[in-house]
Amino acid sequence: MANGADRLDLDGKPIKPMTICMIGAGGFIGSHLCEKLMTETPHKVLALDVYNDKIKHLLEPDTVQWAGRIQFHRINIKHDSRLEGLIKMADLTINLAAICTPADYNTRPLDTIYSNFIDALPVVKYCSENNKRLIHFSTCEVYGKTIGSFLPKDHPLRQDPEFYVLKEDISPCIFGSIEKQRWSYACAKQLIERLVYAEGAENGLEFTIVRPFNWIGPRMDFIPGIDGPSEGVPRVLACFSNNLLRREPLKLVDGGESQRTFIYIKDAIEAVLLMIENPERANGHIFNVGNPNNEVTVRQLAEMMTEVYAKVSGETAIESPTIDVSSKEFYGEGYDDSDKRIPDMTIINRQLGWNPKTSLWDLLESTLTYQHTTYAEAIKKATSKPVAS
């Protein structure tokens, strides 16, 4: 751990140790952020979540150098009177809690809206009323569809970055019809962003809003039937990983034509740490955090993951590595999607001097090595069990 006195912010000022209330600390992003804070900073973390499986390695040993700097509080923020007290104890609150799995957006729209808007309201309220700084995690989905997606497919302007690159302070938020309940998540996230922004404008709340663009890496989501429900449908990286581990074809929804950018979780966490430790540069800003250099179609992602997994596992790919399925078949009625999600990086580069570093191949190799090491044997055991007669 670096000594607090030795650490300077981007303007050369000493970084003072702080206490951080992290809501959703036991999830994918939270676990990596907790690791970063424990190993590289003197800050304390009040880790709030329902589960702590992904941060147990930070909590159990009493002899580690950060013993006493991280406390786990088992809390469901929907109904727990301790929440305001924990926010009061901290200098900064980071809210990571959310339902953020596309398979849930149109099959569990009420839970999605409540989780991402209603349940977040007290967090914003307590931070504002107690003059506590807030870093709120939103999503790139608030942008919805690109302007270019409404042009004919062969229209030359579809290739103009002005029609598809997403800018925090300029790009409109364009959603589908109400019947397309897939947008329940994006709409709830946009509304809580507007509330946070309004609290800043009217009541002086110090805030930063983060819009992640497909952060991927170890510990993302779950593998169905191993450390998650058998019928569960995780996000694309874990979904494809599950198929590869089970030697099943990777399912490409609507042909896998949607384009996405992917960023390594460790790169993204570097950006978040800069926001935490440079409040004068981060307050009042919305930041895209993604890697525009790692743009691929979902089909290309599947092909690359198949190739990388063959390398890390030593197994040859199956004869038909992908299969096309309709969005209705995969996600159910009411699904819709955005064609491209390419972040503009101007604001985060100007304010924090941050740029992502890890190539798509390297981040997939690191992540799939973890997936294979962690899950391959468990899946073999699960699939080799005799069926009861």
Curated annotation (Swiss-Prot):
InterPro entries, sorted: Arna-like_SDR_e, Epimerase_deHydtase, Lipid_A_modif_metabolic_enz, NAD(P)-bd_dom_sf
Cofactor names:
NAD(+)
Q: What quaternary arrangement does the UniProt entry report?
A: Homodimer and heterodimer with AXS1.
The positions annotated for binding NAD(+) are 28-29, 49, 76-77, 96, 185, 189, 215, 235
Cited PANTHER family: BIFUNCTIONAL POLYMYXIN RESISTANCE PROTEIN ARNA, UDP-D-APIOSE_UDP-D-XYLOSE SYNTHASE 2
Q: Name one GO molecular function term.
A: identical protein binding
GO cellular component, alphabetical, reads: apoplast; cytoplasm; cytosol; extracellular region
Q: Which UniProt keywords apply?
A: Cell wall biogenesis/degradation, Cytoplasm, Lyase, NAD
Knockout consequences:
No visible morphological differences. Plants lacking both AXS1 and AXS2 are not viable. Heterozygous axs1/+ axs2 and axs1 axs2/+ mutants have intermediate phenotypes, including impaired seed production, sterile pollen and lost of shoot and root apical dominance; these phenotypes are associated with strongly reduced UDP-alpha-D-apiose (UDP-Api) levels. Cell walls are thicker and contain reduced number of rhamnogalacturonan II-borate (RG-II-borate) complex in heterozygous double mutants.
Where along the chain is UDP-alpha-D-glucuronate bound? 105, 139, 141, 182, 185, 214, 251, 253, 260, 331, 335, 337, 341
Organism listed in the record = Arabidopsis thaliana
What is this protein called in UniProt? UDP-D-apiose/UDP-D-xylose synthase 2
Pfam families, per the entry: Epimerase
Residues the record marks as active site? 185 (proton acceptor)
Q: Which residues lie in coiled coils?
A: none
